[in-house]
Structures are given as structure tokens and as C-alpha cells.
């Protein structure tokens, strides 16, 4: 299994877990002012379904592929730790790129003081799941060594 596929599969599982946390948070009425899907909808004239699709594209494709690419830069097999660090990276990108675009201010300051902490917690969950699942996929489905075309076949 390729690193890219492992990254996207791990990203899918992590995004599903994060989506469950978002739905649970909304159903419990916690931090209702911090609704990431509503923030995505506010960026343009897109519907809620399209915002969820964007959420999955970023979580599965963008972050999944970036995690797979960054995996080779750090030779540790502590995938859970790589995931947590990557979660902080993804959170920082959200705080300095997405939040200002959504008119929520740097680090979500216009939403309220809890915005930065709550989203950090959610990104740490995402990163932890991403790293653990990627590590499990790496253990169970190691990358195939490329064939050497100069080696004669028997």
C-alpha cells in the first residue's frame, strides 16, 4: 500500500471521528457559536452539504496526503506523536488562514475566547487518530519495495 493511500485512509478515519465530535458537540449545545460547518457556509454561497464535502476533502485528501508526505521527513515510528504534532500544524493553518477568511478573526477571536482552545482540542483528536491509523496501516500493509528492472526474473 502506498504512503498516499495510507494517508488518505487514515485521513478518512480521522475525519469521520472529528465529524462525530462536531455532531456530538452540536447536539449537546456546546460552544454553539463555534460551528465549523456554518463557518464554511459563511465563506461563500454554498449549502451545508457542500460545506461537509469541503470538510471531508480537506481532512481526507489535503491533510491525509500532507501527513503521508511529512512521514518520510521524520524517521520516528511514534505515529501517535507525529499525529499530534501534525494536528497542531493543521490547527495553526486553520487559525491563521481559515478563521480570518471566515471573518472570525485570527485564532477565532471574534467567536470567543474558547474558540482557539476548542479547535485545538479537536485538531489534537484528529491528529492522534490520523497518526495511530496511519501507523497501523504501515504495520499491516508495508509499502512494496520497487522492483529492480535490472534483476533477472527466474
Regions found by a protein language model. Name each.
Residues 1-154:
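Juxtamembrane/disordered regions of integral membrane proteins
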Amino acid at each position: 500500500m502506498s504512503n498516499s493511500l495510507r494517508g488518505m485512509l487514515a485521513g478518512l478515519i480521522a475525519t469521520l471521528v472529528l465529524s462525530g465530535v462536531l455532531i456530538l458537540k452540536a447536539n449537546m449545545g456546546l460552544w454553539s457559536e463555534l460551528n465549523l460547518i456554518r463557518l464554511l457556509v459563511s465563506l461563500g454561497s454554498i449549502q451545508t452539504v457542500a460545506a461537509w464535502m469541503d470538510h471531508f476533502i480537506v481532512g481526507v485528501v489535503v491533510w491525509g496526503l500532507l501527513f503521508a508526505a511529512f512521514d518520510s521527513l521524520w524517521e520516528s515510528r511514534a505515529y501517535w506523536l507525529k499525529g499530534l504534532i501534525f494536528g497542531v500544524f493543521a490547527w495553526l493553518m486553520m487559525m491563521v488562514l481559515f478563521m480570518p477568511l471566515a471573518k472570525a478573526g485570527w485564532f477565532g477571536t471574534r467567536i470567543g475566547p474558547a474558540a482557539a482552545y476548542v479547535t485545538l482540542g479537536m485538531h489534537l483528536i484528529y491528529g492522534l487518530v490520523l497518526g495511530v491509523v496511519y501507523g497501523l496501516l504501515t504495520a499491516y500493509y508495508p509499502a512494496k519495495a520497487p522492483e529492480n528492472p535490472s534483476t533477472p526474473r527466474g
